[in-house]
Each structure stands twice: as C-alpha cells, then as structure tokens.
Regions:
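Ser/Thr/Pro/Gly-biased, low-complexity, turn-/loop-rich segments
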Residues: 1-80
Length: 80
C-alpha cells in the first residue's frame, strides 16, 4: 500500500484491511471493496475517526440508514 495514498482501515473478517480512500467513499462500498469474509452477517459495525466512535450500526440496520461517508484515516471495525 502506498503510504502517501490516503486509506480507510478495516478490522475484522475482510480480505483487505486497507481500502484506498477517495472522495465519496461510503461505509458499504468500503466493506464491499475490502471483501467481507465472515460466515455470518456482522452483528456490529463501528466507525472510528480520530479515536472517537462516529458511527455505530447493528449489521442488518446498516441497510436501513443513509450510507455513511468515510474520511481518510477512518477505521471500520466489523464484529460478527
């Protein structure tokens, strides 16, 4: 991964823990790009920005809300 290219970090059952950030990157697109590999639907998805939780979703509820825009350096934690 190019250290000069901004990224979003994903922790949990994904193939790629880094997704290149670009303007307009959303939470669901980042998870799809990272390739979710879990056996179950995620129970909780949390988005951290500068160490603070800025998004906290129950996995299935994620589809019921407007897709969250991510910023460079965000960390997405997926809990099964």
């Amino acid at each position: 991964m190019d250290p000069q290219h901004p990224v979003v970090f994903l922790q949990g059952p994904v193939q790629s823990p880094y997704v290149p950030w670009e303007e307009g990157l959303t939470l669901t697109r980042a998870i799809a790009t990272a390739v979710y590999t879990g056996f179950m639907n995620p129970m909780v998805i949390r988005v951290f920005r500068h160490g603070q939780i800025v998004g906290d979703f129950k996995g299935i509820d994620l589809l019921k809300h407007e897709d969250m825009a991510l910023e460079a350096g965000d960390m997405v934690v997926i809990i099964e």
